[in-house]
Amino acid sequence: MDVTAKYELIGLMAYPIRHSLSPEMQNKALEKAGLPFTYMAFEVDNDTFPAAIEGLKALKMRGTGVSMPNKQLACEYVDELTPAAKLVGAINTIVNDDGYLRGYNTDGTGHIRAIKESGFDIKGKTMVLLGAGGASTAIGAQGAIEGLKEIKLFNRRDEFFDKALAFAQRVNENTDCVVTVTDLADQQAFAEALASADILTNGTKVGMKPLENESLVNDISLLHPGLLVTECVYNPHMTKLLQQAQQAGCKTIDGYGMLLWQGAEQFTLWTGKDFPLEYVKQVMGFGA
């Protein structure tokens, strides 16, 4: 790819960032489509995020992806949020239109799309959702919008717990889905929730390097063959949770599905063009 002065810059702001496949995926897509953009990753945490956004405006960047730990903070630095992003309380995509910043969340639409592409109908179903960070709440919000009957959210009593309660209130007030929030330490409640669940989704970083030997499911017997188990983590590709699920006879969806579909939507938001889906799946080795 020959980058010229006519090219516009798209970024990714996260910390850590070195594990991300997004730059490779997006640049392959941009090159295939023949579009004058280049995508670069920047190590940005909560402390440096405000300055990074000022830099985005000053450099007239087309936009940026936003990942951990900046997804919730980023909402404070855009001029407009989509209705879904307001419901989530976090964004993973910023589009810069001549200094006017719009915030979107494609994590939720991407993950739910991956579930649908597998042939699973979420309408009327119950999801056990692990975590209350930006990705997890995005999945929950989009699932609620698209027809989930109930979401049982489990999170440790950490800095995200109150945010989880606020998220549940927003979803309960604005959709027909019922969301409850429970401390993950309550293993009896967790076991009971899994017994009646249709979907288990890990929206945390547990399972991602260097936590690749960990899973929030301590007892594999809690998983049953009728359960669909889905992951947000894609590094490693086969997390411990997915290994447990396959051993228990569950159908699984790996983190590549969410990465692919959320990235496809981002691509269109930034460029106005269709994402070369089949090409990217092939060159990236995604089975989604």
UniProtKB/Swiss-Prot annotation:
Entry annotated with the keyword Cytoplasm: no
GO MF annotations, alphabetized: quinate 3-dehydrogenase (NAD+) activity; quinate 3-dehydrogenase (NADP+) activity; shikimate 3-dehydrogenase (NAD+) activity; shikimate 3-dehydrogenase (NADP+) activity
Domain of life the protein comes from: Bacteria
Catalytic reaction annotation: L-quinate + NAD(+) = 3-dehydroquinate + NADH + H(+); L-quinate + NADP(+) = 3-dehydroquinate + NADPH + H(+); shikimate + NADP(+) = 3-dehydroshikimate + NADPH + H(+); shikimate + NAD(+) = 3-dehydroshikimate + NADH + H(+)
UniProt-listed SUPFAM superfamilies: Aminoacid dehydrogenase-like, N-terminal domain (SSF53223), NAD(P)-binding Rossmann-fold domains (SSF51735)
Coiled coil: none
Gene3D superfamilies according to UniProt: Leucine Dehydrogenase, chain A, domain 1 (3.40.50.10860), NAD(P)-binding Rossmann-like Domain (3.40.50.720)
Annotated NAD(+) binding sites: A132, G133, G134, A135, N155, R156, R157, D158, K205, C232, V233, Y234, N235, G255
GO biological process, one term: amino acid biosynthetic process
Keyword Cell wall biogenesis/degradation belongs to the record: no
Pathway participation: Metabolic intermediate biosynthesis; chorismate biosynthesis; chorismate from D-erythrose 4-phosphate and phosphoenolpyruvate: step 4/7
PANTHER family: BIFUNCTIONAL 3-DEHYDROQUINATE DEHYDRATASE_SHIKIMATE DEHYDROGENASE, CHLOROPLASTIC (PTHR21089:SF1), SHIKIMATE DEHYDROGENASE (PTHR21089)
Family under the similarity heading: Belongs to the shikimate dehydrogenase family.
Subunit annotation: Homodimer.
Primary role: The actual biological function of YdiB remains unclear, nor is it known whether 3-dehydroshikimate or quinate represents the natural substrate. Catalyzes the reversible NAD-dependent reduction of both 3-dehydroshikimate (DHSA) and 3-dehydroquinate to yield shikimate (SA) and quinate, respectively. It can use both NAD or NADP for catalysis, however it has higher catalytic efficiency with NAD.
UniProt-recorded name of the protein: Quinate/shikimate dehydrogenase
Species the sequence originates in: Escherichia coli O7:K1 (strain IAI39 / ExPEC)
Organism phylogeny: Bacteria, Pseudomonadati, Pseudomonadota, Gammaproteobacteria, Enterobacterales
